[in-house]
């Protein structure tokens, strides 16, 4: 019976970029994740372009795309993430995997994602200390928000106001209309 060696985050970081592209580390194993479509990338880029000026201008912390984090030994790179000033001193630009979790993780539903797998990932984010998780569905033009105070599905006619980034607000339909 063959034994499988489980990878650590340190092992993951030593792998060449091409070996980990479109992969995450889950329970010691490399898991393939689907590549992004054009509209997926456009929504990700739009969200970060709206967040960054607010985050930087108000000195709230950092807003990043596809930054990988350590979720208790698992490596995930949310499409968009944010962490506040108190975590900025932990941020190491030269490190592939940050040794903390973001305050906010946003995922955009990809064509190969299942609801079950996304909810499992979102719950892992929350269980590891991420305060707020956003899941955007381009197909249904909805967003699902998870936090301590609410778990809610927003439709395109509703205002999107996250708790983790004060001052950010946009009608969800307007967000989808801009891609």
Which positions does each model-derived feature cover?
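Gly/Pro/Ser/Thr-rich low-complexity, intrinsically disordered segments predominantly at protein N-termini
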Residues: 1-179
């Amino acid at each position: 019976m063959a034994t499988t060696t489980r990878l650590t985050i340190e092992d993951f970081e030593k792998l060449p970029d091409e070996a980990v592209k479109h992969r995450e580390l889950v329970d010691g194993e490399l898991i393939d994740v689907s590549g992004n479509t054009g509209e997926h990338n456009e929504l990700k880029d739009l969200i970060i372009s709206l967040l960054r000026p607010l985050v930087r201008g108000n000195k709230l912390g950092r807003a990043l795309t596809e930054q990988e984090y350590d979720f208790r030994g698992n490596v995930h790179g949310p499409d968009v993430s944010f962490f506040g000033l108190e975590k900025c001193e932990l941020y190491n630009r030269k490190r592939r995997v940050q040794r903390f979790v973001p305050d906010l993780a946003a995922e955009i539903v990809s064509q190969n994602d299942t609801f079950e797998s996304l909810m499992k990932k979102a719950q892992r984010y929350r269980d590891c200390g991420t305060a707020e998780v956003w899941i955007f569905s381009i197909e249904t033009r909805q967003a699902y928000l998870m936090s301590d105070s609410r778990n809610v599905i927003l439709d395109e006619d509703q205002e999107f106001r996250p708790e983790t980034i004060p001052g950010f607000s946009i009608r969800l339909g307007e967000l989808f209309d801009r891609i």
